[in-house]
A protein has these predicted regions:
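N-terminal active-site segment of His-dependent metallophosphoesterases
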Residues: 1-53, 59-60, 72-78, 83-86, ...
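Binuclear metal-dependent phosphoesterase catalytic core
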Residues: 5-8, 95, 118-122, 140, ...
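Glycine-rich phosphate-binding loop signature in dinucleotide/nucleotide-binding domains
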Residues: 31-35, 98, 119-122
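Short acidic, glycine/proline-enriched helix-loop-strand junctions
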Residues: 53-66, 142
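Helix-adjacent hinge/juxtasegments
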Residues: 62-111
Length: 187
């Protein structure tokens, strides 16, 4: 009898990059250092050219993203995704099966839809953006992840709180914020 072994994965989550090239490069460096298998972007790239930065992800990292409410140039976004190996643009809403996890990605523009997705319990992981509020919360069986905005202009310079990504480690069954300006949490 042959037993099929499930791949244990690490997933990087980012959202609301809002044209911040420097912070996006820092996030990509964290994803590469932590050897994530997937990067999921919950939208609001703004300028489609921002997507091309994700070409710097490790060769085997798969990149998926959805459209945010500030992402108006749909053709440009689609073209940028098409130019990246192992990348796919999922338009406004995406459903993925990664390892054994049913994952939904939605920017969060419609708060009623966001709440319905949370309450539906159809997904193991729900990735949102839009609100610029960081969140890692278990709601029933669904792990809700929102890394908050990556753009530095959404944070006070007088606070330790800053731009973050989320790393979900399936092996440890743990999701955690990684502040892009602090390398102490990178393992």
């Amino acid at each position: 009898m042959m037993v099929k072994k499930l791949l244990i994965v690490k997933i990087g989550v980012v959202s609301d990059t809002h044209d911040d090239i420097e912070n996006t490069k820092k996030a990509i460096n964290i994803f590469n250092t932590m050897k994530v298998d997937y990067v999921l972007h919950a939208g609001d790239y703004i300028f489609p050219g921002m997507i091309s930065l994700f070409k710097k992800l490790n060769k085997d990292t798969k990149f998926y993203g959805v459209r945010g409410n500030n992402d108006g140039e749909l053709m440009g976004i689609t073209r940028q995704f098409d130019e990246i190996e192992n990348a796919q643009f999922l338009n406004e809403f995406g459903k993925l099966l990664i390892s054994s996890k049913n994952i939904a990605i939605y920017h969060g523009t419609n708060s009623d839809l966001s709440e319905s997705l949370k309450e539906s319990q159809l997904f193991d992981i729900l990735i949102l953006g839009h609100t610029h509020i960081k969140r890692i919360e278990k709601m029933g069986k669904t792990l809700v992840l929102n890394p908050g905005p990556l753009n530095r202009n959404f944070f006070s310079k007088n606070t330790n709180d800053g731009p973050c990504v989320i790393i979900y480690d399936e092996k440890r069954e743990l999701a955690e914020f990684i502040n892009i300006n602090s390398t102490q949490n990178i393992k």
